[in-house]
């Protein structure tokens, strides 16, 4: 800019500034001469230069200034605009009308363009733009371009009507609702993590499941007496843990079981199975009572009295007591609960003689036996208590006459208490019909009560031995039973 201004000033004024102008122009002329060496008339150039300096200085200045303008002034003014022309336009404020659209835009995997109308492949549920889908179909390819699955038809869907799975790259399945998409994610993609939990659950459930299966088997098996004999071992296996709690009580049960089943297994396992398998036994006794015993009361009584413990023994006793197979099951169930069942022979008199108070020694026992049958309904509780609790069990059996019967159970004198007799007559009709044999086990515990209560607490076998003698005074009907039971108890 300075050079051009000075040059223009020098040309305009031929005064003192002329020398300066000449000096400044000399290099320019030299440069011009060097550039135009081939030209024949250098003077003419001077005249040309001089003339333009005065009249058309724009020629010389234009040539030189053109370059200078582009390099200096012109470059700054026009160059900036050319280099950043957008700045001028974006200086204006722009008001954007409308709202942001939350609807996602998907791009076609075939053409890479945003999809406005979807072509949805059925049944693979992949989407492409409708044009690509139609073209692909026209080519005769009935396979999805994405997954190579056969395509039955192509659905036309608008933007915003589909929900695409993006949980796993490459899935890209589309669904018509968010609910369907979530179900797909849970079923296809979240299932990978679930198998572990399911496996763990399965591991947890298997142990639980087997017992239920055993229980149903027990329920199914009880009807068959022979099966019942097999059932006790399962119950024993299942019940071993509970025996610890019922160890004393179990000992009493063990003698009965020993007689009824293998002593080794019964001594250890039988007590626990009773506690756990009481329910199963109850069911089995119910079935037996229904099948074998005619009276319905047996079902109700047996249901309550059926406490599982006797069930295993009934199977074993059944073969032994073929004469009284039906009654033996319910009664056996009852005595095992009391754990003084070994003296079953007295029960027969109980069923009939129960009403008879003449039996001096056995009457109190009969009373207890009569009262116990109702408790038999609550047989399971008695089983849980230890041997000493057998009396406590009797109170549960005495649930109908709870106050009176328990004391008699503890001691002979209480046994003779008349109130129990009152309860006995009430329960006698039911027991006589339902449990002719059931009453005997109760009578046995009653008869054994004076001598058995202490002995059974210690060793279960001695009470059994004591039981038969106490039974001996019982009427004749009991004796045949005693003969049957005695071999087992002895």
Swiss-Prot record:
PROSITE patterns: ZF_RING_1, ZF_RING_2. It catalyses: S-ubiquitinyl-[E2 ubiquitin-conjugating enzyme]-L-cysteine + [acceptor protein]-L-lysine = [E2 ubiquitin-conjugating enzyme]-L-cysteine + N(6)-ubiquitinyl-[acceptor protein]-L-lysine. Its EC number is 2.3.2.27. One of its GO terms (biological process) is negative regulation of cell adhesion. Phosphorylated on tyrosine residues. Pathway: Protein modification; protein ubiquitination. Residues 34-60, 254-490 are annotated as: Disordered. Keywords: Cytoplasm, Developmental protein, Metal-binding, Nucleus, Phosphoprotein, Transferase, Ubl conjugation pathway, Zinc, Zinc-finger. The modification Phosphoserine is found at residues 200, 284, 289. Residues 426-441 have a biased composition (Polar residues). A zinc finger (RING-type) spans 108-148. Its main location: nucleus. Residues 341-358, 371-388, 398-422, 456-477 have a biased composition (Pro residues). It is found in: Nucleus speckle; Nucleus, Nucleoplasm; Cytoplasm. A zinc finger (C2H2-type) spans 163-189. GO terms for cellular component: cytoplasm; nuclear speck; nucleus; RNA N6-methyladenosine methyltransferase complex. One of its GO terms (molecular function) is zinc ion binding. SUPFAM superfamilies: RING/U-box (SSF57850). Residues 147-205 are annotated as: HYB domain. The HYB domain forms a phosphotyrosine-binding pocket upon dimerization, and mediates as well the recognition of its flanking acidic amino acids. Belongs to the Hakai family. E3 ubiquitin-protein ligase that mediates ubiquitination of several tyrosine-phosphorylated Src substrates, including CDH1, CTTN and DOK1. Targets CDH1 for endocytosis and degradation. Associated component of the WMM complex, a complex that mediates N6-methyladenosine (m6A) methylation of RNAs, a modification that plays a role in the efficiency of mRNA splicing and RNA processing. Its function in the WMM complex is unknown. Homodimer. Interacts with tyrosine-phosphorylated SRC substrates. Component of the WMM complex, a N6-methyltransferase complex composed of a catalytic subcomplex, named MAC, and of an associated subcomplex, named MACOM. The MAC subcomplex is composed of METTL3 and METTL14. The MACOM subcomplex is composed of WTAP, ZC3H13, CBLL1/HAKAI, VIRMA, and, in some cases of RBM15 (RBM15 or RBM15B). Also a component of a MACOM-like complex, named WTAP complex, composed of WTAP, ZC3H13, CBLL1, VIRMA, RBM15, BCLAF1 and THRAP3. This is E3 ubiquitin-protein ligase Hakai. The gene is CBLL1.
């Amino acid at each position: 800019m300075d050079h051009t201004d000075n040059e223009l000033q020098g040309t305009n004024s031929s005064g003192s500034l002329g020398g300066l102008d000449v000096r400044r122009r000399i290099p320019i002329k030299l440069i011009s001469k060097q550039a135009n060496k081939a030209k024949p008339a250098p003077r003419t150039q001077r005249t040309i230069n001089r003339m333009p300096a005065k009249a058309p200085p724009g020629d010389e200045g234009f040539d030189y200034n053109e370059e200078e303008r582009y390099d200096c002034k012109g470059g700054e003014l026009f160059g900036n605009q050319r280099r950043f022309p957008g700045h001028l336009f974006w200086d204006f404020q722009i008001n954007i009308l409308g709202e942001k659209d939350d609807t996602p835009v998907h791009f076609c995997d075939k053409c890479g363009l945003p999809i406005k109308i979807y072509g949805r492949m059925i049944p693979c549920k992949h989407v492409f733009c409708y044009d690509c889908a139609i073209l692909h179909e026209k080519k005769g390819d009935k396979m999805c371009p994405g997954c190579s699955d056969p395509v039955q038809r192509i659905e036309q869907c608008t933007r915003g009507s589909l929900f695409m799975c993006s949980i796993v790259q490459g899935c890209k399945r589309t669904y018509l609702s968010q609910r369907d998409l979530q179900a797909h994610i849970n079923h296809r993609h979240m299932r990978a993590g679930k198998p572990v939990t399911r496996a763990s659950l399965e591991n947890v459930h298997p142990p639980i499941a087997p017992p239920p299966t055993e229980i149903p088997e027990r329920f199914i098996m009880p009807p068959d007496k022979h099966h019942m004999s097999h059932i006790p071992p399962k119950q024993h296996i299942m019940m071993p843990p509970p025996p610890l709690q019922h160890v004393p009580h179990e000992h009493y049960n063990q003698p009965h079981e020993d007689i009824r089943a293998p002593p080794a297994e019964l001594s250890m396992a039988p007590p626990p199975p009773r506690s756990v398998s009481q329910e199963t036994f109850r069911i089995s006794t119910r079935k037996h009572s229904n099948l074998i015993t005619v009276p319905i009361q047996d079902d109700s009584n047996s249901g309550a009295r059926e406490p599982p413990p006797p069930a295993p023994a009934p199977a074993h006793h059944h073969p032994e007591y073929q004469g009284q197979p039906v009654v033996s099951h319910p009664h056996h169930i009852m005595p095992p609960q009391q754990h003084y069942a070994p003296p079953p022979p007295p029960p027969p008199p109980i069923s009939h003689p129960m009403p008879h108070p003449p039996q001096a020694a056995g009457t109190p026992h009969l009373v207890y036996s009569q009262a116990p049958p109702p408790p038999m309904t609550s047989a399971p509780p008695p089983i849980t208590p230890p041997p000493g609790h057998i009396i406590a069990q009797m109170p549960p059996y005495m649930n109908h006459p709870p106050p009176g019967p328990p004391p008699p159970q503890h001691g002979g004198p209480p046994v003779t208490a008349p109130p129990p007799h009152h309860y006995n007559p009430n329960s006698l009709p039911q027991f006589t019909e339902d449990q002719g044999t059931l009453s005997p086990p109760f009578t046995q515990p009653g008869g054994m009560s004076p001598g058995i209560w202490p002995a059974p607490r210690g060793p279960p076998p001695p009470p059994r031995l004591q039981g038969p003698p106490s039974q001996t005074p019982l009427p004749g009907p009991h004796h045949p039973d005693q003969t049957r039971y005695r071999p087992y108890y002895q």
